[in-house]
């Protein structure tokens, strides 16, 4: 869907369409076959194809857990009905658009493999020059975070460096998180999973603190 929407929005040429470049990068990182990528591009070029709309729904789950559900849909009535139903089923409430935006910050996130022979000091300087806010270096991966307005600059810089980006996306990072006891947190995570299982849902963001105990249960 993301590739198709990007093509409909700004055309089928990745060179002049940063969003399409990002979508193709993510598809390749997820090992999507080349034929599937081409089909998605062609679907976006088809004027008669069903048109997808992007929409974000915001609301609260129990214990003050804020949730933003990003969707891509060809039927808004179906999608909002499903999202409202999930909120209700898990004891939450669907809010109005934009009501929770102050609780999250939009950041660009890039994940790439930590390749042998990479000179980390030089790489970090390149990233900082391109607008990196945070660089996390782990055993096998490097995660670079940037403010939303620097997303394009960072994408271009990584392309210039021929970096093998596995994930390139905009995320909603909570300004503060809420810590719950394990049982309450597990109920919240069941609700998050219900959102993620809906075919129209692309991403789900929340402000639940994912402690080690919670992660062990996932």
List each model region and its residues.
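N-terminal glycine-rich anion-binding loops that anchor highly charged ligand groups
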Residues: 1-17
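Positively charged, low-complexity, intrinsically disordered RNA-binding extensions
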Residues: 109-218
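Translation machinery proteins
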Residues: 14-68
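Residue-level signature of catalytic and energy-coupling elements of molecular machines
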Residues: 3, 37, 83, 127, ...
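RNA pseudouridine synthases
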Residues: 58-72, 79-105
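Flexible hinge/switch segments at interdomain interfaces of large molecular machines
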Residues: 14-17, 54-62, 94-104, 163-174
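Flexible glycine-/small-residue-rich
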Residues: 7, 59-61, 69-73, 112-116, ...
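Helix N-cap / loop-to-helix initiation motif
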Residues: 31-34, 76-79, 119
